[in-house]
């Protein structure tokens, strides 16, 4: 069990690093009373204006519509864990964390040479590594832009995205 947890932590860290390579840019948010985004967005941890803080977005892959409560619980647990680690712990009062409920058609994620799940981001595990397939990276970029334009505080940007994969 511990070995699997470490593997998934490594996968998530790799995914976060992958997304941090996307160029950061500032986009003015539209004037709307009710933010409209592709998927529901939940505040996990917010300490101030998104433009002034480091914005982390947790997105799920392999969570069906019926598993969205589980995703939110997993995302909260992941965020709480991150905020206990350095450097997040020291800067927790300058970090905002959001969860985006991306809905997959099938539960779980794809495994190279094995299961081929129909998920939103098409994350596939290749041994100890994971990556996007079938345009999943473009969907992640689209969701990032959607958040920056329609949800975050005016002029804010997403600093990093963590993709939480449902392994059950």
Feature roles, as predicted:
Residues 1-12:
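Bacterial N-terminal signal peptides that target proteins for export
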Residues 7-8, 26, 145:
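Positively charged, low-complexity intrinsically disordered regions
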Residues 10-22:
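Hydrophobic helical h-region of N-terminal Sec-dependent signal peptides
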Residues 31-159, 164:
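Zn2+-dependent metallopeptidase catalytic core
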